[in-house]
């Protein structure tokens, strides 16, 4: 694990740079106060069971395999850095990767639901990404749905397809489905006056797709590169987690 000890400060340093250099901007996370209170509360209720189960899973993981703590921190830092990158969007807001695919492959979707939510909380507090009232909605899309999509792809394809392709699809589609859900959340809260939910969903989805599809592809490629590096430098830990069991490089 020595190489990871060298990488983790780099990832954390990049995160700190983003924190201190970030400027006010609207992010693809749903911003503070944007959702009506009823919907904001609804998404907290929906995501709460995942947090409870995820915390239990993390406690068992750390108790049984304390050597994985560094990888947990690395996965969280990776998600923080990627999801904090802001790229201008056609709406005057910004788009960003999600970074949840890697942690999901390593630890599963329940663990990532907690890590991703912690990332979102820190972003809301430190760099004005998202918000506290919209944390439930943002956590459901980025920290729950995205990771579960990545997990289904990983579990379904890792024994049937080249591992690089499986990692790419897991990361890229987790990113895309995050914004499909975000579009649905916004459409539910603000249906079109004429076309209702469907028209509003199509409008939000079309806006997000302009920047999010290229970002998802880029995130998939980057996640493959990082995963390959982990295979080379942390193979024992990956085997201990069951990540490489039955997978062919």
Curated annotation (Swiss-Prot):
One GO BP annotation of this record: cobalamin biosynthetic process
InterPro entries, sorted: CbiM (IPR018024), CbiM/NikMN (IPR002751)
Transmembrane segments: 33-53, 70-90, 102-122, 134-154, 161-181, 207-227
Location of this chain's protein in the cell: Cell membrane
Pfam families named among the record's database cross-references: CbiM (PF01891)
Cellular component terms (Gene Ontology): ATP-binding cassette (ABC) transporter complex
Pathway(s) annotated for this protein in UniProt: Cofactor biosynthesis; adenosylcobalamin biosynthesis
Known partners and oligomeric status: Forms an energy-coupling factor (ECF) transporter complex composed of an ATP-binding protein (A component, CbiO), a transmembrane protein (T component, CbiQ) and 2 possible substrate-capture proteins (S components, CbiM and CbiN) of unknown stoichimetry.
Protein name: Cobalt transport protein CbiM
Organism listed in the record: Roseiflexus sp. (strain RS-1)
Gene responsible for this protein: cbiM
């Amino acid at each position: 694990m020595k190489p990871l000890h060298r990488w983790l400060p780099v990832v954390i340093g990049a995160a700190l740079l983003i924190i201190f250099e970030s400027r006010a901007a609207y992010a693809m996370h749903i911003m503070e106060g944007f959702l009506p209170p009823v919907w904001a509360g609804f998404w907290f209720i929906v995501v709460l069971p995942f947090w409870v189960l995820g915390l239990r899973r993390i406690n068992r993981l750390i108790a049984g395999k304390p050597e994985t703590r560094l990888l947990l921190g690395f996965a969280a830092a990776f998600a923080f850095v990627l999801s904090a990158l802001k790229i201008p969007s056609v709406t005057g807001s910004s788009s960003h990767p999600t970074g949840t695919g890697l942690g999901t492959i390593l630890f599963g979707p329940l663990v990532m639901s907690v890590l991703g939510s912690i990332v979102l909380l820190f972003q809301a507090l430190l760099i004005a990404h998202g918000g506290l009232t919209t944390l439930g909605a943002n956590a459901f899309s980025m920290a729950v749905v995205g990771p579960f999509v990545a997990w289904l792809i990983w579990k379904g394809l890792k024994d049937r397809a080249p591992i690089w392709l499986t990692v790419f699809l897991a990361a890229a589609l987790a990113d895309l489905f995050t914004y499909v859900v975000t579009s649905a959340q916004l459409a539910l809260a603000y249906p079109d006056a004429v076309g209702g939910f469907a028209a509003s969903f199509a409008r939000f989805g079309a806006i997000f797709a302009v920047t999010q599809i290229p970002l998802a592809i880029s995130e998939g490629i980057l996640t493959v590169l990082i995963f390959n590096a982990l295979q080379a430098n942390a193979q024992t830990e990956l085997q201990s987690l069951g990540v490489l069991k039955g997978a062919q490089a």
